[in-house]
């Protein structure tokens, strides 16, 4: 069976990506990164999703981006309750580049020629590393910078959610049997994984379920 490495954050998008990769016949190796994020709830969620969706392997890699800082997700910066103009403070400098690089390295080790990530250019909150140009550029880099790219069958970077709305992602996940109740999207989730209901991630998630006409399984710490 062909293999793929899928970035798994523990959120709803990456859970849907795993299901989409499996639908395409890939044996999924899921990679999560402990990068110093504000809470560990999403990594707990990643473990639940990996187990529920039957991945071949789930690896958690430690790369502490708190030593760099520069983001509300890794430093002592307040997370805003509403989106604004420009790139938001929840942008983590070069995060997707770093994570895809880790996935690329593991893909070479396990013999996978395909990488999957959950970046989205529709409801993407303004992050520069969620744009189609970034995904295309990283695929070029992957094939220039690796043994697998130079001597092997080549590497492909898939972003199957790239042009889907959150509602489309919800519908795709429901069709494929994804249990979104296992996932955590909130920037301010508590130790039990309960969402704040007010941050940008919560807003996009709630709107996705509402627009899809699907009951929201999110566990909230307070009424949203």
Swiss-Prot record:
SUPFAM superfamilies: Adenine nucleotide alpha hydrolases-like. Gene3D superfamilies: HUPs. It catalyses: 7-carboxy-7-deazaguanine + NH4(+) + ATP = 7-cyano-7-deazaguanine + ADP + phosphate + H2O + H(+). Zn(2+) binds at residues 186, 196, 199, 202. Pathway: Purine metabolism; 7-cyano-7-deazaguanine biosynthesis. Its EC number is 6.3.4.20. Its cofactor is Zn(2+). Keywords: ATP-binding, Ligase, Metal-binding, Nucleotide-binding, Queuosine biosynthesis, Zinc. One of its GO terms (biological process) is queuosine biosynthetic process. Binds 1 zinc ion per subunit. Catalyzes the ATP-dependent conversion of 7-carboxy-7-deazaguanine (CDG) to 7-cyano-7-deazaguanine (preQ(0)). PANTHER family: 7-CYANO-7-DEAZAGUANINE SYNTHASE. Belongs to the QueC family. This is 7-cyano-7-deazaguanine synthase.
């Amino acid at each position: 069976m062909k293999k793929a490495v899928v970035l798994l954050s523990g959120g709803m998008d990456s859970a849907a990506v795993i299901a989409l990769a499996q639908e395409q016949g890939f044996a999924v190796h899921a990679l999560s990164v402990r990068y110093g994020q504000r809470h560990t709830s999403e990594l707990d969620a990643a473990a639940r999703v990996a187990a529920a969706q039957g991945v071949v392997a789930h690896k958690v890699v430690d790369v502490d981006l708190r030593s760099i800082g520069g983001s509300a997700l890794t430093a002592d910066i307040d997370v805003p309750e509403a989106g604004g103009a420009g790139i938001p403070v929840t942008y983590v400098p070069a995060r997707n580049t770093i994570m895809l690089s880790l996935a690329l390295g593991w893909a070479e080790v396990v013999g996978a020629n395909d990488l999957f990530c959950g970046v989205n250019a529709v409801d993407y909150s303004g992050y520069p590393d969620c744009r189609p140009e970034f995904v295309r550029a990283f695929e070029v880099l992957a094939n220039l910078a690796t043994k697998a790219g130079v001597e092997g069958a080549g590497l492909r970077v898939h972003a199957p959610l790239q042009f889907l709305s959150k509602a489309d992602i919800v519908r795709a996940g429901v069709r494929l049997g994804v249990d979104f109740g296992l996932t955590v999207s909130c920037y301010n989730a508590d130790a039990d994984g309960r969402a704040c209901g007010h941050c940008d991630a919560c807003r996009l998630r709630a709107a996705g379920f509402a627009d899809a006409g699907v009951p929201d399984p999110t566990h909230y710490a307070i009424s949203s």
